[in-house]
Amino acid sequence: LPVVSIELKRLERLVGVPTKVLLQRLPYIGLDIESVEAGSVRVEYSPNRPDFGTDYGIARALRGLLGIELGLPRYRLSRSGVSVKVDGALSRVRPFIACVVASGLRLDSEDIRQLISLQEDLHEGLGRRRRRVAIGLHDLSRVKQPLFYEGLPPSFSFVPLDMKEEMSLARILKETDVGRRYSGALDGASVYPVIRDSSGTVLSFPPIVNGNATRVTTETKEILVDVTGTEKAAGDDVLAIFASTLGEMGGRLGTVEIISGSERRVTPDIKPRAAPLDSALVREVTGLELTEREVIQCIRRSRMDVKGRKVLIPRYRVDILHRVDIAEEVALGYGIDRIQPLYPPSDRPGRFN
């Protein structure tokens, strides 16, 4: 299971409660505490909760459980003016791309470490070791628009991340650790996917490695996130998780227009999903005799909301697939520690022979 290391002082600041309370409540949002030492806590989270891959996502859930913030988190989207033109040659290689811009950021080294950790956890989980989805992070101030997502020959060269000299795409796949590890995602391709800007600067060779020219540092104020892959649904999920995390970091989110032939679409999609409100099922599944008003309050403590007869589920909650999942969220919002276990009466009483 994935593990994330969190600085407790940062988490105190993000949630607004002391460390003692944090350590008491972490298990009640579904996290297992692995260790506490040197001012940090290592927590294990379920792969179906990738939004817990940073302290920002964990703090968001804790603020709900503690009643500090209720209901859907709100992230405003504005037009960034950034566009990506997609090469039709990638239709059989790695056809999907979606992006988001986050501006107004003030990053420290721990922010960057956590973003990279989230990136890698998403690669391994939803990304299926980058075969299905891969993510790139870029300093947008170093990019000249528009951008191009192209299929280029194996002989094309650029300077990969953390390298000082140019390497061809073919050499990267054969001679670098990351290339050998993930080259299987491009087996059989006659052209390789590359993201470049209008000046020819390489942002990324997905799903292998980013370019060195657009690396993110503590001086970066505006990040461009690209998500490429073979499955649109998984790519949209991953981008929603990353966009909401950048929103929690204080970033102003901007849309990116993706142009593929005559098709145009705007990403990311962070609109909440809707599911039926079924208070009777909640009572049946949880065993809690809650009024509908109490059910709604528990839903809001789990950072969801209710409108009419619909439960509004934040887009980053990719784990909620069924009404039973909503019932589980009600139990978490109610407080697992408040639920008293009862042994069911047996209708098969034993007897001595």
Model-derived regions: residue spans:
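Mobile "lid/hinge" segments at catalytic clefts and subdomain interfaces of large enzymes
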Residues: 78, 82-100, 104-118, 122-270
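Extended, well-folded interaction surfaces typified by the phenylalanyl-tRNA synthetase beta subunit core
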Residues: 2-99, 114, 131, 275-278, ...
